[in-house]
Amino acid sequence: MAEAGPQAPPPPGTPSRHEKSLGLLTTKFVSLLQEAKDGVLDLKLAADTLAVRQKRRIYDITNVLEGIGLIEKKSKNSIQWKGVGPGCNTREIADKLIELKAEIEELQQREQELDQHKVWVQQSIRNVTEDVQNSCLAYVTHEDICRCFAGDTLLAIRAPSGTSLEVPIPEGLNGQKKYQIHLKSMSGPIEVLLVNKEAWSSPPVAVPVPPPDDLLQSPPAVSTPPPLPKPALAQPQESSPPSSPQLTTPTPVLGSTQVSEVACQTSEIAVSGSPGTENKDSGEVSSLPLGLTALDTRPLQSSALLDSSSSSSSSSSSSSSSSSGPNPSTSFEPIKADPTGVLDLPKELSEIFDPTRECMSSELLEELMSSEVFAPLLRLSPPPGDHDYIYNLDESEGVCDLFDVPVLKL
């Protein structure tokens, strides 16, 4: 048997075993992958760059790297690097990570302490508010506020929402500063309240800003009228009935309350007249006891009764009235009194009821309306309905234009 001779050396240009190893190919592939843009590498381009004839070896490398989580497949022949770059696994980063974890633990411990203190404070507030002895003292009096600001003037301001407040710089005059507060509201009035410092003093008064003109002027002195003399009672006489039937109203008699305020006793209005008195002025009162003003008490007449005027009805009513006598249920109407027995009216009252006078002064009208003689006022017209105020007025028109009321020059 012949012995084998020595093996011939490989031809020049043939790669060595080390150069064909899988470890060296993996190192070159990872370096190429890290140099790729955004870590994305095409496997065909990598095989051409590394001069790998068998792509099977490239696929073996990508399968191992994908298994340990360093790369991921983007498409069939494209992969992307996921691992950290060089210099990331240093000692400084590890120490920084340990420091951040310790800081997180400390912050969590402080958060737990704050939560515990919050629970304690809430429980303390609940204990104070729910205490029976403290519930009756849950307020502050104005004495407590004044005690805190002794020697100062306290003003309580109540203003609507949206009020603007301006406090200019105080100006010093002779060593004293002058403070000013400017309040402006577009939605409603502003009320300024002076806080009472003494409990025994009068209650505070709310004054609007600016104060009205009537508060700046002193109120007029009220004069008390002198006591009136007691009137004398007169005997009523029989009067002739009117020439035509009329709807009459009973003569008003003052109540006990009003009479007691004027003359301290009750009295009646006596009417006297003569049979020959005309019916034209039959509604006037002959005498005015207790200082009352002369009122026009003419009875109401219907238009139908005024048209049917006959002398026969007048004579028949006169005979029946004289035969039957006065009926207590019948309402007698006042007639004109004897001119000799009429009291002279004062000058003021005669000027008031003068028919030739155009109008009365506003002061005299207010005085009459405030007296007890003309109060209370009775509404003669029906109450306003839903269709009474359905008209609109221009900016240049007023209430007088709506109701056709002439403007009086008082």
From Swiss-Prot:
Chain positions with N-acetylalanine modification: 2
Keywords assigned: Acetylation, Activator, Cell cycle, Cilium biogenesis/degradation, DNA-binding, Nucleus, Phosphoprotein, Transcription, Transcription regulation
Gene name, Swiss-Prot/TrEMBL: E2f4
Region (Transactivation) residue spans: 334-410
Name of the protein: Transcription factor E2F4
Cellular component, GO annotation: chromatin; cytoplasm; nucleoplasm; nucleus; transcription regulator complex
Organism listed in the record: Mus musculus (Mouse)
UniProt DNA-binding region: 16-85
Pfam families linked to this entry: E2F_CC-MB, E2F_TDP
